């Protein structure tokens, strides 16, 4: 019930046991407290500690400024509460108690001492790593939810386990072991000790398989990044789906995203890095593997339902289209923005879309990059069902139980809304070259001229490749049609427009060169 409430209110939930501090406060409060111990020990001043904290954890305020904003009494009482149940390590430092008793805010002025930066970072990281790994030992929650709590709840750039992987397990172990020399009653948590002996990074899962009665749920859990697809996420998706497909206790698989998005596309940073570092083969392998994962979902013997709530852009919409059925809430918004950033859909979007709603409307959506809400997608046959957020779970369960969860994609011409009845013939084969050459820019028809202006702002080469791929694959078997997207992948990512478009995301509308 609590998880459902979180979904209905657009909140990101994590599952924890009823434990002191739950998950986030369990390591956040000691992080604040350790900052005051560093000050008390004379290792560094407040500006130095705040600077290190901001840089190390990717945040806008250090612990002292944060305590000034949220209240020093809250920090002190939180430490006392945890200490009463967990021991002296959590007790407020003498310096924190003194500041509380003074009734004054922490003084934030002073010069940063560069010589103390490393030791401060080691102490802060050691405290967080120690408590985070002890949460695993106590079974309070898992590392994915701990990291998620840090990123969503505290706005840290990375969660504790991601940071441990970044600095290295050996370094993390040393930071904790050094910190605990001052606490002889404590030992390095067993999970960190074991990971140190293995000498491998933490296996943080961004896609989880959860058995829910006779339903299997594959949940993309990277809400801090809108569940964007990258190499790791796609690998985890593959593994989680294979687990779901082989679970004989379930009759259907639900694909869903945690947080406010289904999947908001692919991780743009990966594409940019591949282009700049001349690693187009890595980009090709990623896309090829992604296609194979979506093909396995498409070809699964089990019923697969994509539960779409929030954004489904690019690769996210392509993932949803690989399911047998798409069930959305009115909050769902979907589209293919790729031609507006210099590329084209590469995970089957050109092929599955054209098969479901026809070439003409597929080209319209891909050429324009238009984002459409769930009700519009339903009206043109791109999604199968739309239910209110408070009904969708029960509707999915009842339709599956009654054997009535069946695809309803595609629409006859006369069933389309008036706007799309007009759009569809405009994107017939004989008119495509005129769209690509900008001949409709001066049209007297307002809809045609407006659409032409939108298309004129897209990457010309991406538009032509998309058109070519849709046409070439339309009469092929789907598996062969999807591979048409791979045939031109290195070519499109080698264009100047691809780099211009991909690096423009979040910075304004790109100006393409057509080369």
Name each model feature, range by range.
Residues 325, 364, 368-370, 376, ...:
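Well-ordered beta-strand positions
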Residues 198-260, 277, 281, 288, ...:
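Conserved CoA-thioester-binding segment of acyl-CoA-metabolizing enzymes
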Residues 350-360:
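Hydrophobic, secondary-structure "cap" segments at the distal end of domains
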Residues 257-293, 312, 340-342, 512:
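Glycine- (often His-adjacent) and acidic-residue-rich active-site loop
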Residues 293-341, 373-374:
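Glycine-rich beta-to-alpha active-site loop
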Residues 1-213, 221-224, 274, 278, ...:
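N-terminal glycine-rich phosphate-binding loop for ADP-containing cofactors
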Residues 218, 222, 236-237, 255, ...:
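Terminal peptide-recognition signature
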């Amino acid at each position: 019930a609590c998880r459902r409430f979180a979904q209905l209110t657009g909140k990101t939930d994590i599952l924890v046991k009823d434990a002191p501090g739950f998950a986030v406060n369990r390591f956040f409060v000691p992080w604040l407290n350790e900052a005051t111990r560093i000050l008390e020990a004379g290792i560094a001043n407040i500006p130095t500690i705040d600077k290190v904290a901001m840089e190390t954890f990717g945040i806008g305020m250090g612990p002292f400024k944060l305590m000034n904003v949220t209240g020093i009494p809250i920090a002190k009482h939180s430490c006392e509460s945890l200490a009463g149940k967990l021991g002296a390590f959590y007790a407020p430092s003498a310096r924190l108690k003194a500041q509380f008793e003074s009734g004054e805010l922490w003084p934030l002025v002073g010069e940063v001492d560069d010589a103390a930066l490393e030791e401060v970072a080691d102490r802060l990281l050691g405290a967080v790593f120690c408590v985070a790994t002890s949460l695993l030992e106590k079974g309070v929650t898992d590392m994915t939810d701990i990291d998620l709590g840090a990123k969503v709840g505290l706005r840290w750039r990375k969660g504790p386990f991601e940071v441990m992987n970044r600095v290295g397990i050996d370094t993390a172990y040393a930071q904790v072991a050094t910190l605990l020399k001052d606490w002889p009653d404590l030992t390095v948590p067993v999970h960190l000790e074991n990971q140190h002996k293995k000498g491998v990074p933490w296996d943080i899962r961004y896609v989880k398989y959860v058995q829910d009665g006779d339903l299997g749920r594959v949940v993309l859990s990277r809400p801090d990044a809108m569940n964007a697809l990258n190499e790791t996420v796609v690998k985890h998706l593959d593994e989680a789906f294979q687990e779901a497909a082989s679970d004989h206790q379930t009759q259907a698989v639900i694909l869903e995203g945690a947080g406010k998005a289904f999947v908001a596309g692919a991780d743009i940073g990966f594409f940019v890095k591949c282009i700049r570092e001349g690693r187009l083969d890595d980009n090709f392998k990623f896309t090829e593997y992604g296609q194979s994962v979506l093909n396995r979902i498409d070809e699964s013997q089990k019923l697969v339902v994509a539960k779409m709530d929030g954004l489904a852009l690019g690769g996210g919409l392509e993932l949803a289209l690989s399911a047998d059925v798409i069930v959305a809430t009115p909050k769902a918004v979907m589209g293919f923005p790729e031609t507006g950033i210099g590329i084209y859909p590469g995970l089957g979007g050109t092929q599955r879309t054209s098969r479901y709603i026809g070439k003409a409307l597929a080209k319209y959506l891909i050429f324009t990059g238009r984002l459409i809400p769930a009700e519009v997608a339903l009206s043109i046959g791109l999604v199968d069902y739309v239910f209110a957020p408070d009904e969708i779970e029960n509707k999915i369960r009842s339709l599956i139980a009654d054997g009535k969860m069946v695809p309803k994609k595609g629409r006859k011409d006369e069933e389309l809304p008036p706007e799309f009845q007009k759009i569809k013939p405009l994107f017939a084969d004989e008119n495509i070259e005129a769209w690509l050459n900008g001949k409709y820019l001066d049209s007297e028809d307002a809809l045609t001229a407006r659409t032409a202006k939108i298309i004129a702002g897209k990457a010309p080469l991406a538009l032509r490749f998309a058109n070519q791929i849709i046409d070439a694959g339309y009469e092929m078997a789907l598996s062969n049609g999807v591979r048409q997207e791979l045939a031109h992948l290195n070519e499109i990512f080698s264009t100047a427009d691809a780099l211009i478009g991909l690096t423009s995301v979040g910075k304004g509308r790109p100006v393409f060169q057509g080369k």
